[in-house]
Amino acid sequence: GSLNEVPPVQLASKVLKALEKRNNINTEDVDDVVLGCVHPIGEQGADIARTAVLESNWHQTVSGVQVDRFCASGLEAVNIAAAQVMSGQSDLSVGGGVESMSRVPLGSSGGAWMADPTVAYNSYFVPQGISADLLATKYNYSRTDVDSYAVSSQKRASEAWKDKRFKNSIIPVKDQNNLPILEIDEYMRPETTMQSLGALEPSFEKMGKSGFNDVAILKYPELEAIEHVHHAGNSSGIVD
């Protein structure tokens, strides 16, 4: 996407600067910035929250910490920032998330869960896509169910954008010459139909047949087979 050439620290710092400007914040009053970040290595490593604080020219007393809970990283960061305020530990904390899947690809940080054969075997490890299809099978979500929800979601997103419901939540990403790089979500496809989605092949069927289906069924023996219902049109995308 359009953001593939923008370093993640720049994405984060642009948001912090906009937050300061829009809310007339005296950054000296901010106690902490908590940012969720999957695979906090390379350009996203070395505590990207604190790095973004420095790049944003916020007050030097503002601390920063990064959190990695995979897909829930940003939400977890917001929860932590809120908990700091609720507990009285902080008067003002900022919570959010940043990541560039184009620049720091999925799986970059490795880890024993999938790389160590003993750990993978003992934990019945399967890739996330297989897990998604497993859950759909276990809880009776058919291909029609997930495709119809995707169609509805695309239309809702487009209508919300047209109604400017996100105008106070989104800023354009601009380059060093103040020229726009991205101003609108590229992932919205309001023209999506059940027919167009029906032409897409399941993304994880071949992977499942390679052996991961058997691993999943070992863990969930109540299932006789895994129905592969997810594909690029009804799943989250790499949106940077």
Q: Which residues make up each language-model segment?
A:
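Flexible glycine-/small-residue-enriched beta->alpha junction loops
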Residues: 86-139
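Short acidic, glycine/serine/threonine-rich loops at helix termini
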Residues: 1, 45-46, 103-109, 186
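Conserved active-site "lid/cap" helical segment
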Residues: 1-56, 63, 71, 134-143, ...
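Active-site-proximal alpha-helical scaffold in enzymes
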Residues: 67-98, 136-166
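N-terminal extracellular/periplasmic Venus flytrap/periplasmic-binding protein-like
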Residues: 4-14, 22, 148-239
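Conserved catalytic cysteine-centered active-site region
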Residues: 6, 37-91, 111, 123-130, ...
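Glycine-rich nucleotide phosphate-binding loop and flanking beta-alpha elements
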Residues: 41, 100-102, 157, 237
